[in-house]
């Protein structure tokens, strides 16, 4: 009975909170996301780089027609080192200058020069060039790094390139005028404590850039999308999602999934999103309540165990 009352109470509180939630007084901005729908088999082909970049530029110029505050490209939109290719960097700088709009570009990078570790990064570009960068912190095990490499080093022979990524160490909040924002890359969206760090660091909305082409036409992209409402509700923050092959979407602070682009479609998605105005209880306190509940539960189990233990002499 107690468990049922707790469940009903929790659901009732959540429904009431959603019904009374208001964004009155909050500012808002227009955001555009690009979904180029580049097949995984073509994405990393050097012979396709020019063609793929042309697709991105065309979609970006189309997105700029509605005058968004920022245009979001997906994870690893450029599969060559952006900072190591002056011609590519200059082309993107000119593109941002031409449309008078910052662009968030997912790209591969290197740490400390041409022989450094690979990084999965997001670059904030304006007409002045790169003004900020975020390096992915939570890497995909056996995809971007090998856990326990000392014991499982033989795995590197199976995936020599993608298993040598380094992890970032800074939760960058991008300096979009009037609307600073953070981004999580790919499956980083499943980590509430990482997401929380961007919000308490000043992000007024969040972006999620990803390349879900790996999943193909499976339920994977939809399951991945399904984690966004959890993060949105925890922080009462809007999320804009740019996915290579889908599903690109917008999620409002109440966790409602808004406009989406179909899986494998190519196009542009626009939405006016509210900016965060306050911090939730979870944003302020973090996971301490979870730890407290776990401690109370363990203590209760221990007390019950010792009370039931038969007396011995």
Q: For each predicted feature, which ranges?
A:
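Enzyme catalytic cores with a strong preference for nitrogen-chemistry domains
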Residues: 1-313
């Amino acid at each position: 009975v107690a468990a049922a009352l707790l469940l009903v109470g929790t659901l009732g509180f959540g429904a009431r909170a959603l019904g009374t939630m208001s964004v009155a007084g909050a500012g808002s901005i227009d955001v555009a996301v690009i979904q180029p729908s580049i097949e995984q088999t073509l994405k990393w082909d050097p012979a396709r780089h020019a063609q793929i970049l042309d697709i991105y530029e065309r979609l970006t110029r189309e997105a700029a027609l509605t005058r968004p505050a920022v245009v979001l490209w997906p994870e690893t939109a450029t599969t060559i080192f952006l900072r190591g290719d002056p011609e590519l960097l200059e082309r993107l700088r000119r593109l941002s200058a031409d449309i008078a709009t910052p662009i968030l570009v997912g790209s591969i990078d290197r740490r400390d020069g041409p022989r450094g570790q690979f990084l999965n990064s997001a670059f904030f570009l304006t007409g002045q060039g790169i003004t900020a960068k975020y390096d992915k912190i939570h890497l995909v095990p056996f995809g971007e790094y090998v856990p326990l490499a000392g014991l499982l080093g033989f795995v590197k022979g199976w995936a020599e390139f993608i298993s040598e990524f380094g992890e970032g160490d800074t939760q960058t909040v991008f300096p979009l005028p009037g609307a600073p924002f953070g981004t999580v890359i790919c499956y980083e969206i499943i980590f509430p404590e990482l997401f929380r760090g961007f919000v308490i660091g000043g992000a007024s909305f969040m972006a999620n850039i990803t390349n879900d082409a790996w999943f193909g036409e499976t339920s994977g992209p939809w399951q991945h999308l399904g984690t966004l409402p959890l993060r949105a509700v925890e922080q009462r923050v809007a999320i804009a999602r740019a996915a290579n092959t889908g599903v690109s979407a917008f999620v409002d602070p109440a966790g409602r999934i808004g406009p989406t682009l179909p899986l494998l479609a190519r196009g542009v998605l626009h939405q006016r999103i509210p900016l965060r105005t306050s911090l939730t209880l979870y944003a302020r306190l973090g996971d301490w309540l979870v730890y407290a509940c776990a401690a109370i539960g363990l203590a209760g189990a221990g007390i019950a165990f010792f009370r039931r233990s038969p007396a011995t002499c």
